[in-house]
Amino acid sequence: MQADTIKQEIRRLLKERNAVLLAHNYMRDEVQEIADITGDSLGLSQEAAKTAADVIVFCGVHFMAESASILSPHKTVLLPRRDAGCPMADMVTVEGLLELKARHPGVPVVTYVNSSAAVKAVSDICCTSANAVKVVNSLPDREVIFVPDRNLGQFVAKQSDKAFHFWDGYCPTHERLKADVVARLKAENPDALFICHPECNPAVVALADHACSTSGMYDYCRKSPAKRFIIGTEAGILYKLRLENPDKEFILASPALVCPNMKLTSLEDILDALTTMAPVVQVPEDIRVQAKRALDRMIAIPRD
């Protein structure tokens, strides 16, 4: 089947199923192109909860579909590729986190949304890369346990006076970007600003003109008078950056910045999911209620 035919059939089935198609910023270009809404993981889940759709087709990875299920328990959540996981989310287990909590009794657990529903359920509050500093600094406690991303945790710690206990997790894709590669690119492109995600190694973040979430990158690059940018996050972000800023140049900091899990989902997978109404992601109610509490505490923190 031709790509255009597949897209037409996807649109037809979305209407027939009263479904909304969500695509994360790191998805393949053609998936972002056909999506009803693109964005970061939590933002997409929140948008989906607001819609009148009965079905959410989440083009992302497993923990993202779980978040959609947590916030929209009465909607059917489809994850076109059941095998689309997140290595960083898999690095932290409930058992391991409970052991860490036992070693630091009374210390609140701040959990990055890039984590499983089960881990969120034994956490005190969640955070995103966009609001992590604000979430941590909103807590009255002098110490925090931060899971699972040590790189984001260190980025936050530099902007907080609290003591941190880090889980030793990381994003393999962002970790592949090395400081020497960035330094060389910056030297070769002195007029370009280097923008990176705080999931990058601290040595890379130290070289950045600006470090922020994916949604922050769109905003920063749109408003900046600069015309050239070196981008230090997953390659999928380039699609929308170039679409929104046709007069600007975006250079991917490394060809290694490709997440294999984010690239699994194809148009054919989306069509199959809508045709068969599977695979469904549904978080068990006891875990859902506890995980939602941690998400709700984060959402309750006022935005700037």
From Swiss-Prot:
The cofactor binding remark recorded in the entry reads: Binds 1 [4Fe-4S] cluster per subunit.
Q: What is its EC number?
A: 2.5.1.72
Q: What is this protein called?
A: Quinolinate synthase
- Described function: Catalyzes the condensation of iminoaspartate with dihydroxyacetone phosphate to form quinolinate.
- Pfam families for this protein: NadA
| UniProt superkingdom | Bacteria
- The cysteines joined by S-S bonds are none
- Where does this protein hold iminosuccinate? 24, 41, 112-114, 129, 197-199, 214
Q: Which InterPro entries match?
A: NadA, NadA_sf, Quinolinate_synth_type2
